[in-house]
Amino acid sequence: MTRFILIFGYHVAMLKLLVICLSAALVASAAELPTRKYLNLAAIKTMVAAAESEAQKRNVQVTICIMDESGNLLFLQKADGATLNTIQFAQKKAKYAALYGRPSKVAEDSLKSGNLGVLVFPDGFPNQGGLPIKVDDKIIGGIACSGAASEVDEAISQVAINALLK
Protein backbone atom coordinates (compact mmCIF):
# COMPACT_ATOMS: atom_id res chain seq x y z
CA MET A 1 0.00 0.00 0.00
CA THR A 2 2.82 2.37 0.85
CA ARG A 3 4.41 1.57 -2.47
CA PHE A 4 1.13 2.42 -4.26
CA ILE A 5 0.91 5.77 -2.47
CA LEU A 6 4.51 6.59 -3.36
CA ILE A 7 3.99 5.72 -7.04
CA PHE A 8 0.62 7.48 -7.13
CA GLY A 9 2.10 10.53 -5.40
CA TYR A 10 4.98 10.58 -7.88
CA HIS A 11 2.57 10.52 -10.84
CA VAL A 12 0.43 13.28 -9.34
CA ALA A 13 3.53 15.41 -8.81
CA MET A 14 4.66 14.81 -12.39
CA LEU A 15 1.18 15.65 -13.68
CA LYS A 16 1.19 18.89 -11.70
CA LEU A 17 4.61 19.76 -13.11
CA LEU A 18 3.39 19.04 -16.63
CA VAL A 19 0.34 21.28 -16.14
CA ILE A 20 2.53 24.08 -14.80
CA CYS A 21 4.94 23.79 -17.75
CA LEU A 22 2.14 23.76 -20.31
CA SER A 23 0.45 26.72 -18.65
CA ALA A 24 3.69 28.67 -18.69
CA ALA A 25 4.19 27.81 -22.36
CA LEU A 26 0.69 29.01 -23.22
CA VAL A 27 1.20 32.26 -21.34
CA ALA A 28 4.57 32.76 -23.05
CA SER A 29 3.00 32.10 -26.46
CA ALA A 30 0.22 34.58 -25.82
CA ALA A 31 2.72 37.17 -24.63
CA GLU A 32 4.71 36.82 -27.84
CA LEU A 33 1.84 37.67 -30.17
CA PRO A 34 2.75 40.79 -32.10
CA THR A 35 0.72 43.92 -31.72
CA ARG A 36 -0.08 45.75 -34.92
CA LYS A 37 -0.54 49.47 -35.22
CA TYR A 38 -3.09 50.55 -37.78
CA LEU A 39 -4.89 53.64 -39.00
CA ASN A 40 -8.14 53.89 -37.06
CA LEU A 41 -10.83 56.50 -37.69
CA ALA A 42 -9.46 58.90 -35.07
CA ALA A 43 -6.01 58.80 -36.69
CA ILE A 44 -7.50 59.38 -40.13
CA LYS A 45 -9.56 62.34 -38.89
CA THR A 46 -6.46 63.88 -37.30
CA MET A 47 -4.51 63.58 -40.54
CA VAL A 48 -7.34 64.88 -42.71
CA ALA A 49 -7.93 67.91 -40.47
CA ALA A 50 -4.24 68.80 -40.64
CA ALA A 51 -4.12 68.34 -44.43
CA GLU A 52 -7.26 70.43 -44.95
CA SER A 53 -5.89 73.19 -42.74
CA GLU A 54 -2.56 73.23 -44.57
CA ALA A 55 -4.24 73.26 -47.99
CA GLN A 56 -6.42 76.16 -46.86
CA LYS A 57 -3.35 78.08 -45.61
CA ARG A 58 -1.73 77.56 -49.00
CA ASN A 59 -4.96 78.43 -50.81
CA VAL A 60 -4.99 75.22 -52.86
CA GLN A 61 -7.77 72.72 -53.58
CA VAL A 62 -6.57 69.16 -53.29
CA THR A 63 -7.82 65.62 -53.13
CA ILE A 64 -6.66 63.77 -50.02
CA CYS A 65 -6.29 59.99 -50.05
CA ILE A 66 -5.27 57.62 -47.26
CA MET A 67 -4.58 53.90 -47.79
CA ASP A 68 -3.77 51.11 -45.35
CA GLU A 69 -0.46 49.23 -45.56
CA SER A 70 -1.91 46.87 -48.19
CA GLY A 71 -3.03 49.70 -50.45
CA ASN A 72 -6.71 49.49 -49.53
CA LEU A 73 -8.64 52.74 -49.58
CA LEU A 74 -9.44 54.13 -46.13
CA PHE A 75 -10.28 57.74 -46.98
CA LEU A 76 -10.77 59.86 -50.10
CA GLN A 77 -11.95 63.46 -50.30
CA LYS A 78 -11.91 65.85 -53.25
CA ALA A 79 -12.05 69.51 -52.30
CA ASP A 80 -14.44 71.80 -54.11
CA GLY A 81 -12.48 73.21 -57.02
CA ALA A 82 -10.06 70.29 -57.31
CA THR A 83 -10.14 68.71 -60.75
CA LEU A 84 -11.51 65.21 -61.27
CA ASN A 85 -8.17 63.73 -62.34
CA THR A 86 -6.82 64.44 -58.85
CA ILE A 87 -8.98 61.61 -57.51
CA GLN A 88 -7.04 58.96 -59.41
CA PHE A 89 -3.70 60.69 -58.97
CA ALA A 90 -4.07 60.90 -55.18
CA GLN A 91 -5.11 57.23 -54.99
CA LYS A 92 -2.17 56.09 -57.10
CA LYS A 93 0.37 58.15 -55.16
CA ALA A 94 -0.96 56.95 -51.78
CA LYS A 95 -1.04 53.33 -52.92
CA TYR A 96 2.53 53.51 -54.22
CA ALA A 97 3.73 54.99 -50.91
CA ALA A 98 1.90 52.35 -48.87
CA LEU A 99 2.95 49.33 -50.93
CA TYR A 100 6.55 50.29 -51.63
CA GLY A 101 7.20 52.11 -48.35
CA ARG A 102 8.77 55.16 -49.93
CA PRO A 103 7.67 58.54 -51.23
CA SER A 104 6.16 58.57 -54.71
CA LYS A 105 8.85 61.14 -55.57
CA VAL A 106 11.36 58.26 -55.57
CA ALA A 107 9.58 56.82 -58.61
CA GLU A 108 9.44 60.26 -60.24
CA ASP A 109 13.18 60.82 -59.71
CA SER A 110 13.94 57.34 -61.02
CA LEU A 111 11.94 58.02 -64.18
CA LYS A 112 13.62 61.40 -64.66
CA SER A 113 17.02 59.70 -64.48
CA GLY A 114 16.02 57.40 -67.34
CA ASN A 115 14.78 54.33 -65.50
CA LEU A 116 11.73 53.36 -67.55
CA GLY A 117 11.27 50.23 -65.44
CA VAL A 118 9.30 52.34 -62.99
CA LEU A 119 6.49 52.45 -65.52
CA VAL A 120 5.91 48.69 -65.36
CA PHE A 121 5.66 48.44 -61.56
CA PRO A 122 2.17 47.44 -60.54
CA ASP A 123 0.64 50.44 -58.83
CA GLY A 124 3.73 52.50 -59.51
CA PHE A 125 3.03 56.17 -60.01
CA PRO A 126 5.97 58.44 -60.74
CA ASN A 127 4.65 61.70 -59.33
CA GLN A 128 5.56 63.50 -56.11
CA GLY A 129 2.94 63.87 -53.38
CA GLY A 130 2.55 60.44 -51.80
CA LEU A 131 4.26 59.48 -48.54
CA PRO A 132 4.38 56.28 -46.51
CA ILE A 133 2.93 56.50 -43.01
CA LYS A 134 5.37 54.84 -40.60
CA VAL A 135 5.13 54.21 -36.88
CA ASP A 136 8.13 52.63 -35.14
CA ASP A 137 9.70 52.06 -38.58
CA LYS A 138 6.69 49.96 -39.67
CA ILE A 139 4.55 51.02 -42.61
CA ILE A 140 0.93 51.36 -41.56
CA GLY A 141 -0.33 53.13 -44.67
CA GLY A 142 0.18 55.80 -47.27
CA ILE A 143 -1.16 59.31 -47.77
CA ALA A 144 -1.20 61.52 -50.81
CA CYS A 145 -2.55 64.82 -51.93
CA SER A 146 -3.11 65.89 -55.50
CA GLY A 147 -4.22 69.16 -57.02
CA ALA A 148 -1.43 71.62 -56.27
CA ALA A 149 2.17 71.65 -57.47
CA SER A 150 3.73 68.27 -56.67
CA GLU A 151 6.05 69.64 -53.98
CA VAL A 152 3.05 71.33 -52.32
CA ASP A 153 1.08 68.07 -52.49
CA GLU A 154 3.93 66.33 -50.67
CA ALA A 155 4.28 69.13 -48.11
CA ILE A 156 0.57 68.86 -47.25
CA SER A 157 0.90 65.08 -46.91
CA GLN A 158 3.87 65.58 -44.58
CA VAL A 159 1.91 68.01 -42.39
CA ALA A 160 -0.80 65.35 -42.04
CA ILE A 161 1.74 62.70 -41.00
CA ASN A 162 3.36 65.10 -38.53
CA ALA A 163 -0.04 65.74 -36.94
CA LEU A 164 -0.54 62.00 -36.46
CA LEU A 165 2.89 61.42 -34.94
CA LYS A 166 3.00 64.34 -32.51
Write out the residue ranges for each language-model feature.
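Short, Lys/Arg-enriched N-terminal segments with co-localized hydrophobic residues
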Residues: T2-A13
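Sec-dependent N-terminal signal peptides
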Residues: L17-A25
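Sec/Tat signal peptide C-region and signal peptidase I cleavage site
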Residues: L26-A30
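Flexible, solvent-exposed loop/hinge segments and secondary-structure transition points
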Residues: A31-K166
